[in-house]
């Protein structure tokens, strides 16, 4: 069986279970694909080639294990998640030499399920960015056009999946960082409900917003990975202690969209939405209607305020979370400081990038005694209103549907000098994180002007990932496949 990297995760998993393919063959095929594509897309920061081959050989020697749903499947992980014995930098120079001794909960779950971790994916520094150009090490390029961005902050993960370097990757979503790069790279990305997946071992950006989720090539694959990483973990006090649904069974039980009410908020379809994105997304809605869905209008009136509220809340939490990187306990340490203050200032100035410093300063400002009420308290009030908007909308629909990004992938460097314009790229994704609800991004076509992937997002009720996945699976199967990335042909 040749070109294994072109298979879905479900297909390679089944081939491995039947011993039609060895785990070592799957790993070697992905490593060969990485060797071919990595010089063009720069999706990886750390590669575990030798370790992955050894792990695959050990699995082959033991034989397939039906109790391990990812047995022998090669995957990658965003570099914000700790991996025992493998560097974890969060895309930052300040953690350049950090090698953790423990796995993040989600990584631990992958290993227990039999997955083989090939490497760690590039990302915007501390997950602060929308293009993966804020990485301290290198920008990642979009496999569909290597002159364009892959999105962010999980751009490395999206690029790896789209390029066939792995069968799945774990990303993180604080304000759209799974869904947006999935949309721009033409793959599937699931942002779970806040608390569905433990954040233990995740290098924090915004602790009340961060969530870990799968990035794959099909909705079925996302359901498989989600079933592995979801679950309670007592080491994360925000992790929900509730049963995990059988997501695969949810997919199998739905064959059309009869009886499904899809809400369409006008706020997601107005000014700023490019015509090619609107065209592709409306075609997907037409396909949903043909499958039996009922399209209803809903309102999310506080969507315009979500950008300001998000950047106040997220920056405030980041300023607290990143205070620990001071050059004293761990991380980059300035050389020959004159005194303690010089150590602090130089370690952080040299170790943290411009965007991270910008958000730390913003967060410190909005939390200061003179401005807390004017900014942070108001942002918290807007956040509650946004959650109320979603609750009201779900009174009349089962899922909400809209574009992920107002535009397709833009050229590298086009927005780096204009951070405010970059922030606007997340206008359709931020509110979901503020509400703590789940969202699924899936590709719906290629832009008529740019030829780049367009994604649509399905938004759901709290802990109702099963509905999102089952609806998304039916819809995605009815849409024409995108084909292989044009930039790598």
From Swiss-Prot:
InterPro entries, per the entry: Amidase, Amidase_CS, Amidase_dom, AS_sf, GatA
GO biological process: translation
The entry's keywords: ATP-binding, Ligase, Nucleotide-binding, Protein biosynthesis
The enzyme's E.C. designation: 6.3.5.7
Catalytic residues, chain numbering: 78, 153, 177
Transmembrane parts of this sequence: none
CC annotations in GO: glutamyl-tRNA(Gln) amidotransferase complex
Single annotated GO MF: glutaminyl-tRNA synthase (glutamine-hydrolyzing) activity
Enzyme class, UniProt record, top EC level: ligase
Catalysed transformations (reactions): L-glutamyl-tRNA(Gln) + L-glutamine + ATP + H2O = L-glutaminyl-tRNA(Gln) + L-glutamate + ADP + phosphate + H(+)
Entry's family note: Belongs to the amidase family. GatA subfamily.
Record's function text: Allows the formation of correctly charged Gln-tRNA(Gln) through the transamidation of misacylated Glu-tRNA(Gln) in organisms which lack glutaminyl-tRNA synthetase. The reaction takes place in the presence of glutamine and ATP through an activated gamma-phospho-Glu-tRNA(Gln).
NCBIfam families, A to Z: gatA (TIGR00132)
Assembly and oligomerization: Heterotrimer of A, B and C subunits.
Name by which UniProt lists this protein: Glutamyl-tRNA(Gln) amidotransferase subunit A
Native source organism of the sequence: Nitratidesulfovibrio vulgaris (strain ATCC 29579 / DSM 644 / CCUG 34227 / NCIMB 8303 / VKM B-1760 / Hildenborough) (Desulfovibrio vulgaris)
């Amino acid at each position: 069986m040749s070109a294994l990297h072109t298979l879905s995760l479900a297909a390679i998993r089944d081939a491995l279970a039947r011993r039609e393919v060895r785990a070592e063959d799957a790993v070697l095929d992905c490593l060969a694909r990485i060797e071919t594509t990595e010089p063009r897309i720069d999706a990886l920061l750390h590669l575990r080639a030798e370790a992955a081959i050894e792990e695959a050989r050990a699995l082959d020697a033991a034989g397939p294990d039906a109790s391990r749903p990812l047995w022998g499947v090669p995957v990658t992980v965003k570099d914000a998640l700790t991996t025992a014995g493998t560097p974890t930098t969060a895309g930052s120079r300040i953690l350049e030499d950090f090698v953790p001794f423990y796995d993040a909960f989600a990584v631990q779950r992958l290993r227990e399920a039999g997955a083989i971790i090939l490497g760690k994916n590039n990302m915007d520094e501390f997950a602060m960015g929308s293009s993966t150009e804020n990485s301290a090490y290198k920008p990642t390029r979009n496999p569909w056009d290597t002159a364009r961005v892959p999105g962010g902050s999980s751009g490395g993960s999206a690029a790896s999946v789209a390029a066939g370097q792995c069968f799945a990757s774990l990303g993180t979503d604080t304000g759209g960082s799974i869904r947006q790069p999935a949309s721009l790279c033409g793959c599937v990305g699931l942002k779970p409900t806040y608390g569905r997946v433990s954040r233990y071992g995740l290098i924090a950006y915004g602790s009340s917003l961060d969530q870990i989720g799968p990035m794959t090539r099909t909705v079925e694959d996302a359901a498989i990975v989600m079933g592995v990483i979801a679950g309670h973990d007592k080491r994360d006090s925000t992790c929900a202690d509730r049963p995990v649904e059988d997501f695969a069974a949810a997919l199998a039980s739905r064959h059309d969209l009869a009886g499904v009410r899809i809400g369409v908020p006008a706020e997601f379809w107005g000014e700023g939405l490019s015509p090619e994105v609107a065209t592709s997304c409306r075609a997907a809605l037409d396909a949903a209607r043909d499958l039996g869905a009922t399209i209803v209008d809903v309102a999310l009136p506080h969507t315009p305020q979500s950008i300001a509220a998000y950047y106040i809340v997220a920056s405030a939490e980041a300023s607290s979370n990143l205070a620990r990187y001071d050059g004293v306990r761990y991380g980059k340490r300035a050389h020959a400081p004159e005194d303690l203050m010089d150590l602090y200032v130089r370690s952080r100035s040299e170790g943290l990038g411009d965007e991270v410093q910008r958000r730390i300063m913003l967060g410190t400002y909005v939390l200061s005694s003179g401005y807390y009420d004017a900014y942070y308290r108001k942002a918290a009030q807007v956040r509650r209103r946004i959650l109320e908007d979603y609750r009201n909308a779900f009174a009349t629909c089962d899922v909400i549907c809209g574009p992920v990004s107002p535009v397709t992938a833009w050229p590298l460097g086009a927005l780096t000098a204009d951070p405010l314009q970059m922030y606007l790229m997340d206008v359709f994704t931020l509110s979901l994180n503020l509400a703590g609800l789940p969202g699924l991004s899936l590709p719906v076509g290629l832009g008529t002007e740019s030829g780049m992937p367009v994604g649509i997002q399905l938004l759901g009720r709290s802990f109702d990932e099963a509905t999102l996945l089952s609806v998304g699976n039916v819809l995605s199967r009815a849409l024409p496949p995108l084909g292989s990335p044009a930039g790598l042909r």
